[in-house]
A protein has these predicted regions:
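Bacterial N-terminal signal peptides that target proteins for export
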Residues: 1-11
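Short beta-strand-centered segments that line the small-molecule binding cleft or hinge
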Residues: 133
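Polar helix-capping/helix-linker motif
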Residues: 136-137
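N-terminal twin-arginine translocation
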Residues: 3-4, 20-23
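N-terminal secretory/targeting leader peptides
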Residues: 14, 24-130, 140-314
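Bacterial N-terminal signal peptides
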Residues: 10-19
Length: 314
């Protein structure tokens, strides 16, 4: 663990200690008198709360927020797609049809390409560097300004670790191997593979397993090792390539329409932002553990873990 990572996580741990004291002090009814009636936000998530990693982060954030506010501010989790399609949640926030959302920043790239820097930057920063940039560096202002232009308050609320490199029905060791191969990847990583001769196949995450199983695509990315293992990709009998060059890290956001967010009492807004910082600390510490366990599980089930060749990575 690097000094930089230690400093970042210790700093975020300090945030946890700070609000822990605030919760104790805030348990008294008199301390809540200035914020009015209790509030429950309906928050649709892009991630199944029962899945590891980003799904767990949804539940952790809502529990933290409830404890911090002594129950005055709570969040009702709405399952993916229940009120709005996952990819359209930002539009639903802007229109006011959705009260709050917990999502991947990359979905917002359809509104402004700059969001791709936070959601899926090939060969980009790792999770610790991403967290530092979006919390304390120039990324903080870039992220905020991009959402401001849409009339949305976007609070960084988690940092996902690296994805797996993908599952493939064919060997990919050289640039020539990519010619005419049909692959599922994201927007920016798709530009990389198409330049190498591959055909980009846009597929919703929920359809990738079936298409890969049926041979309708030749391979591509799904998610992190923990997520891939939980979704049963080991049953395909295909090799799993590492590392996930296409997405070394990704920011998760809490979203509300700005005018709606600013109507919340100031203590609630502060608690949301502090709970999100705490959630970033949690995701940074949680990810390496569950990814290592997932890779061991995949190996035990017979999956061959392959490293990308030096020719491709260099």
């Amino acid at each position: 663990m690097t000094v930089r990572r230690n400093s970042l996580i210790l700093g975020l741990a300090g945030v946890l200690c700070a609000w822990a004291g605030a919760v104790t002090a805030g348990d008294k009814p008199s301390d809540r008198a200035d914020i009015g009636a209790a509030v429950t936000l309906q928050m649709q998530t892009a991630f199944n709360p029962n899945l590891p990693g980003s799904g767990e982060a949804v539940r952790t954030f809502t529990k933290t927020l409830k404890h911090m506010s002594a129950g005055a501010l709570s969040v009702k989790i709405v399952e993916p797609g229940r009120l709005a399609p996952t990819r359209d949640m930002l539009d639903a926030i802007i229109s006011g049809d959705l009260e709050a959302a917990f999502t991947w920043t990359g979905y917002a790239a359809t509104k402004a390409p700059v969001f791709g820097l936070f959601g899926s930057l090939p060969f980009g920063p790792g999770p610790e560097e991403m967290a530092s940039w979006v919390l304390e560096g120039d990324g903080r202002q870039i992220h905020r300004a991009a959402y401001d232009k849409l009339g949305v308050t976007g609070v960084p609320c988690g940092v996902q670790g690296p994805k797996g490199g993908g599952w493939f029905r064919t060997e990919l060791n050289t640039v020539a191997d990519f010619k005419d191969v049909r692959l599922r990847y994201g927007r920016l990583s798709g530009e990389v593979i198409t330049r190498m001769g591959a055909t980009l196949v846009p597929l919703p995450a929920g359809e990738f397993f079936y298409h890969l199983q049926q041979g309708k695509v030749d391979g591509g990315e799904m998610s992190t090792p923990a997520m891939d293992a939980a979704l049963g990709f080991d049953k395909l009998g295909l090799p799993y390539y590492m590392p996930g060059w296409q997405q070394p890290s990704a920011v998760l956001d809490f979203l509300m329409k700005r005018e709606r967010y600013e109507k919340l009492p100031a203590p609630f807004r502060a608690q949301i932002e502090t709970a999100c910082r705490a959630n970033i600390a949690w995701t940074l510490s949680r990810a390496p553990h569950i990814q290592a366990l997932a890779l061991e599980k995949l190996k035990a089930s017979g999956v061959v873990i392959k490293q990308w060749s030096p020719e491709l990575m260099d």
